[in-house]
């Protein structure tokens, strides 16, 4: 009889304790730490990355460069336009500062022209970017090129807006 009373008491108390343990107190996390994930990493007041290793800094910088890694070309052209110089200079600075990193320059063309012509044009575009980077001091061993011609369009379409987005070279780390 005594054992039944104890068991009944436990059967009521255990679920109540489990529910109480699972509930959260909304005021408990009011110490200001919520939403501070990553606080301590990132830029310090001097513009440097406070407690990041040089490898982490290089990886972060590379990720930022990958946001701006496309050089566009005019129709049937492969010369680097002046509006892409600053972007390519940033890539060159990164590669010079990080000789262990390598980049592949992918050359592309729009769908007009024969496959052979477009492969050749894509190669000349990729090579133009490679030569620009080498002219800024990047080692030739860090740069490889490939041409896809018209085989990998960035934009599908048969108008000048699509064509202009497909005439490009892409820097891929």
Curated annotation (Swiss-Prot):
N-palmitoyl cysteine-type lipidated residues: 22
GO cellular component: cell division site; cell outer membrane; membrane
GO terms under biological process: cell division; cell septum assembly; regulation of membrane invagination
Compositionally biased spans, kind Gly residues: 35-50
Pfam families noted in UniProt: OmpA
UniProt KW keywords: Cell cycle, Cell division, Cell outer membrane, Lipoprotein, Membrane, Palmitate, Signal
InterPro entries to which the protein is assigned, alphabetical: Bact_OuterMem_StrucFunc, OMP_bac, OmpA-like, OMPA-like_CS, OmpA-like_sf, Pal, Pal_lipo_C
Signal sequence residues: 1-21
Disruption phenotype: Mutants lacking the tol-pal cluster suffer delayed outer membrane invagination and contain large outer membrane blebs at constriction sites and cell poles. Tol-pal mutants fail to complete division and form cell chains, and fail to process denuded peptidoglycans at the septum.
Region span, Disordered: 30-58
Stretches assigned to the OmpA-like domain: 60-173
Lipid attachment site numbers (S-diacylglycerol cysteine): 22
Highest taxon listed in the record's lineage: Bacteria
Topology class, membrane: Lipid-anchor
Compartment list: Cell outer membrane
Function summary: Part of the Tol-Pal system, which plays a role in outer membrane invagination during cell division and is important for maintaining outer membrane integrity. The Tol-Pal system is also required for polar localization of chemoreceptors clusters. The system also appears to be required for the activity of several outer membrane-localized enzymes with cell wall remodeling activity.
Family matches, as HAMAP family: Pal (MF_02204)
Entry's family note: Belongs to the Pal lipoprotein family.
Protein name: Peptidoglycan-associated lipoprotein
Species this chain originates from: Escherichia coli (strain K12)
Encoding gene per record: pal
